């Protein structure tokens, strides 16, 4: 029987957010991190120039950049981003629109503590075209997923999901915009639950102390 992985509660949790794009998920976490919210963003890591880095700087959050092109191999980049992330001593890492696959060095250090979001109800429609694939298949309901990151593409243990109906006349843009709203709220709730209650992972099953719900 596989040995359980137990990640203890860490509130108030130190968050490192990895991002490559507009920073909408990062902004949601920054906006949430007030009052008694059980997590704070302590650093943002990027792999390119992007709006997310600007949002972090505007919020006086330290930013570090680890570009793949600046390293002789993907393995070397993996070592570098692991070290840069570890320097901020995170309790949790959030991959928030980060357009790189995290490697074995990173996962050996942060597995069970690294979250990702996906704009579909996994395991359906993984990968970068989840919204378009759901529309092409003709589903009537899709949604958002928050999961732990593993070595695969959107294959890690699922922490939380929320359905989003597909409306008549939806195209990829309109559907994706509605999913993004749910995705942001679900991520904020999942981070809070993980920070407060921790998680136990056995194989593909992740169990937290309470169910993740969004209002």
UniProtKB/Swiss-Prot annotation:
Function comment: Catalyzes the transfer of a formyl group from 10-formyltetrahydrofolate to 5-phospho-ribosyl-glycinamide (GAR), producing 5-phospho-ribosyl-N-formylglycinamide (FGAR) and tetrahydrofolate.
UniProt-recorded Gene Ontology molecular function terms: magnesium ion binding; phosphoribosylglycinamide formyltransferase activity
Enzyme Commission designation: 2.1.2.2
Binding-site residues, Mg(2+): 116-117
Protein name as it appears in the record: Phosphoribosylglycinamide formyltransferase
UniProt KW Transferase keyword: yes
Organism: Mycobacterium tuberculosis (strain ATCC 25618 / H37Rv)
Domain of life, per lineage: Bacteria
Binding-site residues for (6R)-10-formyltetrahydrofolate, renumbered to this chain: 74, 100-102, 116, 150-154
Membrane-spanning residues: none
């Amino acid at each position: 029987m596989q040995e359980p992985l137990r990640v203890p509660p860490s509130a108030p949790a130190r968050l490192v957010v990895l991002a490559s794009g507009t920073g909408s998920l990062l902004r949601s976490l920054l906006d949430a991190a007030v009052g008694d919210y059980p997590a704070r963003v302590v650093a943002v890591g990027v792999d390119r120039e992007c709006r997310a880095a600007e949002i972090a700087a505007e919020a006086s959050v330290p930013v570090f950049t680890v570009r793949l092109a600046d390293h002789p191999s993907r393995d070397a980049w993996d070592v570098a981003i692991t070290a840069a992330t570890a320097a901020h001593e995170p309790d949790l890492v959030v991959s928030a629109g980060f357009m790189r696959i995290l490697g074995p060095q990173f996962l050996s250090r942060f597995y069970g503590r690294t979250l990702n979001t996906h704009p579909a109800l996994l395991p359906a429609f993984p990968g970068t075209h989840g919204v378009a694939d759901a529309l092409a298949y003709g589903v009537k309901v899709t949604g958002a997923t928050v999961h732990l990151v593993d070595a695969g593409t959107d294959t890690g243990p699922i922490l939380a999901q929320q359905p989003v109906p597909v409306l008549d006349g939806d195209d990829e843009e309109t559907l994706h915009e509605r999913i993004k709203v749910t995705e942001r709220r679900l991520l904020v709730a999942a981070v809070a639950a993980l920070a407060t209650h921790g998680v136990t992972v056995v194989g593909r099953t992740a169990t937290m102390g309470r169910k993740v719900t969004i209002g």
